[in-house]
Amino acid sequence: MIVQFVALLLLNLLQIIAAESSHTNNWAVLISTSRFWFNYRHTANVLGIYRSVKRLGIPDSQIILMIADDYACNSRNLFPGTVFDNADRALDLYGEEIEIDYKGYEVTVEAFIRLLTERVPENTPASKRLLTNERSNILIYMTGHGGDGFIKFQDAEELSSEDLADAIEQIHQHKRYNEILFMVDTCQANSLYTKIYSPNVLAIGSSEVGTSSYSHHADIDIGVAVIDRFTFSNLEFLENRVDSKSKLTMQDLINSYNPYEIHSTPGVQPINLRRSPDDILITDFFGNVRDIELHSEKINWMLPGENTTKPSIKRNSFVFQAQNDMQDDGKGFGISNLKSFLPPTRELKYKKHPISRIISAVVCISFSIGFPYYASKYLK
């Protein structure tokens, strides 16, 4: 019995190690639930986060952007077609080729729940669907007006903490995520994640139960506040300290929160999380998994028969020789040594887990020794 228990324990350890290496793609669901001109800052909040995740590599195809009102085209906007999150108006958040997937009255509690649970009509385009799998990390960022255990949508309906928790559990049961970062900027934000019970969720809120979240500053010409303090704190960290190769962790971001500057007490709740925030890179949620390098250098390719001498191909100051292997014998373009001619491709390297091999060996030995004894004694 002891051998059997040890074997099961080791199998569980193997599953944990495998799960930690299963993260292959990142998705972001970014939503501003408010409408009306005086809530301009909520759209600026979400567009600021949207810009950060795009800068760090998440493509629009893996970002669901939901904005409940069109402030860029509002008749009160002194700067038509723009949205700013700073009074200096140095960066137009609406001019970054944004792709809004749900807007106006499309942004409802029902639409949000259907998006998370993939209970959408069959003809719903991919841009309006959360096409995640068990290897997906999901960032869910919400901003708007809220209260104890709810957040308002369109100033007409509410999403409760219970409904949110049940939706996340459905995602879990259908194996549609690896880990979730739930971040919310609203009054009494921390109450919105108290009912979540699904595993591997890191929840961060802007304010405690019974307290409000506050705007950071206003633009005199626009006439309203342009960003909230909690989101401003996050963007200040992300934009100034994080790039696509950053090794900063979620704990570093959490440690940067200053309640005195934010004017509220942010909350952090790891919910059945298998990793510590110290071990979770910020780019595990805000960046792209693939490390993509863009090259602007021109490559002088030679057509067959143009030059029979050894052509050189320059790429990143490295010279590759085709070794006269380019031939055109009338039967088509042939290269006898393709690797010597083509530009190099970077080999994909995956993290190895040597401990898993040791554990596997121990499990096999345990079974080979323990099972015959167990069978002879209990299975007669």
From Swiss-Prot:
Lumenal-facing ranges: 20-354
Transmembrane regions: 355-375
Chief place of localization: endoplasmic reticulum
Stored InterPro entries: GPI_transamidase, Peptidase_C13
Subcellular location(s) of the protein: Endoplasmic reticulum membrane
Class in the EC hierarchy, top level: hydrolase
Swiss-Prot/TrEMBL keywords: Disulfide bond, Endoplasmic reticulum, Glycoprotein, GPI-anchor biosynthesis, Hydrolase, Membrane, Protease, Signal, Thiol protease, Transmembrane, Transmembrane helix
Post-translational modification: The disulfide bond between PIGK/GPI8 and PIGT is important for normal enzyme activity.
Pathway in which this enzyme or protein is active: Glycolipid biosynthesis; glycosylphosphatidylinositol-anchor biosynthesis
GO biological process: attachment of GPI anchor to protein; GPI anchor biosynthetic process; proteolysis
Residues at the active site: H145, C187
A GO cellular component entry from the record: endoplasmic reticulum
Enzyme Commission number(s) from the entry: 3.-.-.-
Molecular function as annotated in GO: GPI-anchor transamidase activity
Membrane topology term: Single-pass type I membrane protein
Signal peptide (from-to): 1-19
Known glycosylation sites: N307
Residues in compartment: Cytoplasmic: 376-380
Family statement drawn from the similarity comment of this UniProt entry: Belongs to the peptidase C13 family.
Purpose: Mediates GPI anchoring in the endoplasmic reticulum, by replacing a protein's C-terminal GPI attachment signal peptide with a pre-assembled GPI. During this transamidation reaction, the GPI transamidase forms a carbonyl intermediate with the substrate protein.
Binding partners and assembly: Forms a complex with PIG-T homolog, PIG-U homolog and PIG-S homolog.
The name this protein goes by in its record: GPI-anchor transamidase
